[in-house]
Amino acid sequence: IHLSLWFYIFLHLIHARMINKIGILCTYSFPEGMAPTIRILSYGQGLVDNGCKVEVVIFQPKVGDNAYSLSGYVGGVKYTYAHKRDTNKSKLYKLFVDRPKSLLNAIKKIRNSHKEEKFDCILLSFDYPIYLLFFAPVLRIIGIKVGFIGDEFPEPIRRLKSSIPFSYKLAYKFVYQFISFRVLMTEALQRFYNELVCEKPTYILCSILNTARFDGIVKQKVSRKYMCYMGNMMLAKDNVDNIIRAFKRVCDDFSDVDLYLYGTPNDKDKSIVEGVISELGLGNRVFIKGRIDYNLVPQTLANAEILVTSQPATKRAAGGFPTKLEEYMMSHTPAIVTNVGEIHYYVQDNNTVYLVEPYDDVAYAEKMRYILSHPQEAKEVAGRAYNYAIANFGSKEVTKKLIDFLDNTL
């Protein structure tokens, strides 16, 4: 009996969770922001739900006003900005004073927190070589293991280039001497880094969402029915013009449904979108709604007749997975999605979403028409999408697997 008890205790110790505290270092706005912010917040809340402590350090100098303070807790996730930029200073001051202060303060905050309770690892959620060259070696010198989170190809490819400069390759090869593992969004990214830099233990995490945001959300009556696009409206990433042209083909047959575009495009992209709207005579049917409050997203998606997104078939699209897709699927609203990258690995046409090939506004319009003409069937598809998202994209479930990966890797 005693031997059996000791054997049970031994097995329990082997399988016990060893990951207790994780840091995430990033450059973008937090806790409010676009897709990268939403993903990191979902990572953090999922890890917290699984019993980990999570600290997010934002080292880019803070820009603009934010409803949140420079440090605090959101959903159990601790966050802090390394430095607040003085927006009245010159560009040279920001470059040579603000930026170094931010980098050094980030290290100081991480080191102090590490002294209080050791980090099991720090996840670097950026791919800029100059920052990787600074943070990865310094963190290892401090005694913290380092991992890399990647949800897109590096910057030149995000700008629709076919490859990255030779200098980037050299920088990555050096930096990865200090990085222990990767958490990547797609298999395409894994192949890219394995072939370009070196192989590392890799966990594929295509999508993640704090599903609790959608608890209790039901469709409400609205004064005017609408289809909804929600994203950053960057045309290199989301060719919204394809959606508008498709809508033009069906709008006369469904005169009670408008098209709402939520997002904050840059001036150039906004001008192009406005030009397409004007060219097609849709000024009274298609509306650029601007940025929407993070907390209003679930209800806005749920109230729509159709959720739409469109991506061009680019190398950039091959490396990523649209964060908006899991939000769409959680809303109980039917969604039209372009079949690019690895999306078809996870969703099926007419089963969980409505897939359409990229650039084909005629086929896209037919999907719109079909959904609006078959509301009951579309509702069933949306219901299956919700169940799939709960089972496969929920932050607690996904990060539990991530913790298992880290336990076996670190």
Language-model regions: role of each:
Residues G23-L25, Q220-D238, I243-F247, Y260:
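Conserved donor-binding/catalytic core segment of Leloir-type glycosyltransferases
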Residues S42, I107, R111, I130, ...:
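Membrane-proximal helix-turn-helix segments that form the acceptor-binding/catalytic region
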Residues K145, Y172-I217, M230-G231, V286:
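Donor nucleotide-sugar binding/catalytic pocket of nucleotide-sugar-dependent glycosyltransferases
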Residues M230, D258-I272:
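Glycosyltransferase donor-sugar binding loop
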Residues S271-L296:
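Nucleotide-activated donor-binding/catalytic signature segment of Leloir-type glycosyltransferases, i.e.
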Residues L301-A318, T333:
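Acidic donor-binding loop of glycosyltransferase active sites
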Residues I306-T309, E327-M330, P334-V337, Y354:
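Short hydrophobic beta-strand element within catalytic cores of glycosyltransferases
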Residues D349-D361, Y370-P375:
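Conserved acidic donor-binding segment of nucleotide-sugar-dependent glycosyltransferases
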